[in-house]
Amino acid sequence: MAGSYPEGAPAILADKRQQFGSRFLSDPARVFHHNAWDNVEWSEEQAAAAERKVQENSIQRVCQEKQVDYEINAHKYWNDFYKIHENGFFKDRHWLFTEFPELAPSQNQNHLKDWFLENKSEVCECRNNEDGPGLIMEEQHKCSSKSLEHKTQTPPVEENVTQKISDLEICADEFPGSSATYRILEVGCGVGNTVFPILQTNNDPGLFVYCCDFSSTAIELVQTNSEYDPSRCFAFVHDLCDEEKSYPVPKGSLDIIILIFVLSAVVPDKMQKAINRLSRLLKPGGMVLLRDYGRYDMAQLRFKKGQCLSGNFYVRGDGTRVYFFTQEELDTLFTTAGLEKVQNLVDRRLQVNRGKQLTMYRVWIQCKYCKPLLSSTS
């Protein structure tokens, strides 16, 4: 979608897709010639059918007692997810450097372009399959849940990591990565499918990457990964909705905050405060990069009655939850937190299963929001 564009370029250039988004379906007869098509416009009938489907699967809501359980024990459901799948569920997100060149700003863009061309098929496949637990969760959960009972339980690192964070006195002079010149935080890092590609690709000696997840199992998998380098990365357990827990960095210290399919797992009523807190961590000119589910994505349409928690907010069969956004909702969240829009676009893709002759309509939203630079008077 968005590629690198000159500083000060018109905002419309930020929404112009330069590398991805170039395969258009002009002849419906060719739909099964490729695995995916970009910028697929929906007909009025298709949009109306999607709206009806959502109305149908939203009629019956999850009882309040279960909703409380899903909220209180959210970290346990995600721990179970990572105990089952470990680091085998998601693929490394190498496509991020095409979508978000801000993650490797000092890298030669021609070098990144050459790398992309050499690995185009692999990168495109990973991007086409990019998702949260989403569509195949139900099937995998059914066949994998029993295996969880037989796995060797490893001690959680949550208490250990949380204690280390609480022992840190967060100040402007001394904190993990305090000597770095470019700092990135990924919230909801999972097992490192974003963090490790960043560390591998961005060789800036001044780079330091923070990553957090409220699943202690996920953080343990990050810390025990052979690619984990404490001199360049700090992984910690954190619940972005817990206002009592502080981040291990001072306010105004981060250049980039990454939210990839994570905000959608938060209860809608808690989203604004979470974004407000993250916004305060950004330097002036710092940026939030987000990619998440859009309204009427196929994953939303596939939910059954009885899985809806509230409007456009659902629970999966394994207890993890997901919200489906509109562009306007995300814009309100970020601008209310004092950030300015750089990019807010809908990625409508038609994915194709050529073997089964199936078409699948995906809807994702990608955003970039920037913290305003300080004025000379301030």
From Swiss-Prot:
Pfam families from the UniProt entry: Methyltransf_12
Primary localization: cytoplasm
InterPro entries, A to Z: Methyltransf_12, METTL2/6/8-like, SAM-dependent_MTases_sf
Keyword entries, A-Z: Acetylation, Cytoplasm, Methyltransferase, Phosphoprotein, S-adenosyl-L-methionine, Transferase, tRNA processing
Domain of life the protein comes from: Eukaryota
Residue numbers of Phosphothreonine PTMs: T154
Modification N-acetylalanine, positions: A2
EC number: 2.1.1.-
Cellular localisation: Cytoplasm
Keyword Transferase among UniProt keywords: yes
One GO cellular component, as annotated: cytoplasm
Residue positions, PTM Phosphoserine: S4
Keyword match S-adenosyl-L-methionine: yes
Reactions listed under catalytic activity: cytidine(32) in tRNA(Thr) + S-adenosyl-L-methionine = N(3)-methylcytidine(32) in tRNA(Thr) + S-adenosyl-L-homocysteine + H(+); cytidine(32) in tRNA(Arg)(CCU) + S-adenosyl-L-methionine = N(3)-methylcytidine(32) in tRNA(Arg)(CCU) + S-adenosyl-L-homocysteine + H(+)
Job description of the protein: S-adenosyl-L-methionine-dependent methyltransferase that mediates N(3)-methylcytidine modification of residue 32 of the tRNA anticodon loop of tRNA(Thr)(UGU) and tRNA(Arg)(CCU).
Quaternary structure note: Monomer. Interacts with DALRD3.
PANTHER family, alphabetized: METHYLTRANSFERASE-RELATED, TRNA N(3)-METHYLCYTIDINE METHYLTRANSFERASE METTL2A-RELATED
Name listed for the protein in its UniProt record: tRNA N(3)-cytidine methyltransferase METTL2B
Species this protein is from: Homo sapiens (Human)
Gene from which the chain derives: METTL2B
